[in-house]
């Protein structure tokens, strides 16, 4: 067998129907569009147009707003951190920061920081520097003998810099 001899089985592929190419083709003249009217013309179907009826996107009320100051935080559970420690991706002695979480592959990118959540079990004694932490996460870390310091992440600090002011 050679690459230039490979072909589909007979009848496996069907040629595309070219419309509007003469009456004898079976799809000539109106090309399967019927006769006249808006749908027979080009540039048909105005998106969202419902024939004069009030369209759905205008019948439904506007709702909510986009908060310009909302923080886009990575949510990390204690269980994931314990798995990383067990796998040797996180150093027990070092402080767990946004940068170390990215390096360990727990989060993909820094975004606006990290919120520590208390789902899962933590047995390793770790110290954390995170943007936010839930009460249950702080309790679980302290129960394991570690500590949590909430660091307000500002622009450069989440993007690899080292400017972090403790709150």
Curated annotation (Swiss-Prot):
<dbReference type="GO" id="GO:0019843">
    <property type="term" value="F:rRNA binding"/>
</dbReference>
<dbReference type="GO" id="GO:0006412">
    <property type="term" value="P:translation"/>
</dbReference>
<dbReference type="GO" id="GO:0022625">
    <property type="term" value="C:cytosolic large ribosomal subunit"/>
</dbReference>
<dbReference type="InterPro" id="IPR021131">
    <property type="entry name" value="Ribosomal_uL15/eL18"/>
</dbReference>
<dbReference type="InterPro" id="IPR030878">
    <property type="entry name" value="Ribosomal_uL15"/>
</dbReference>
<dbReference type="GO" id="GO:0003735">
    <property type="term" value="F:structural constituent of ribosome"/>
</dbReference>
<feature type="compositionally biased region" description="Polar residues">
    <location>
        <begin position="1"/>
        <end position="10"/>
    </location>
</feature>
<comment type="similarity">
    <text>Belongs to the universal ribosomal protein uL15 family.</text>
</comment>
<keyword id="KW-0694">RNA-binding</keyword>
<comment type="function">
    <text>Binds to the 23S rRNA.</text>
</comment>
<dbReference type="InterPro" id="IPR001196">
    <property type="entry name" value="Ribosomal_uL15_CS"/>
</dbReference>
<comment type="subunit">
    <text>Part of the 50S ribosomal subunit.</text>
</comment>
<protein>
    <recommendedName>
        <fullName>Large ribosomal subunit protein uL15</fullName>
    </recommendedName>
</protein>
<feature type="region of interest" description="Disordered">
    <location>
        <begin position="1"/>
        <end position="37"/>
    </location>
</feature>
<keyword id="KW-0687">Ribonucleoprotein</keyword>
<feature type="compositionally biased region" description="Gly residues">
    <location>
        <begin position="21"/>
        <end position="35"/>
    </location>
</feature>
<dbReference type="InterPro" id="IPR036227">
    <property type="entry name" value="Ribosomal_uL15/eL18_sf"/>
</dbReference>
<dbReference type="InterPro" id="IPR005749">
    <property type="entry name" value="Ribosomal_uL15_bac-type"/>
</dbReference>
<keyword id="KW-0689">Ribosomal protein</keyword>
<dbReference type="Pfam" id="PF00828">
    <property type="entry name" value="Ribosomal_L27A"/>
</dbReference>
<keyword id="KW-0699">rRNA-binding</keyword>
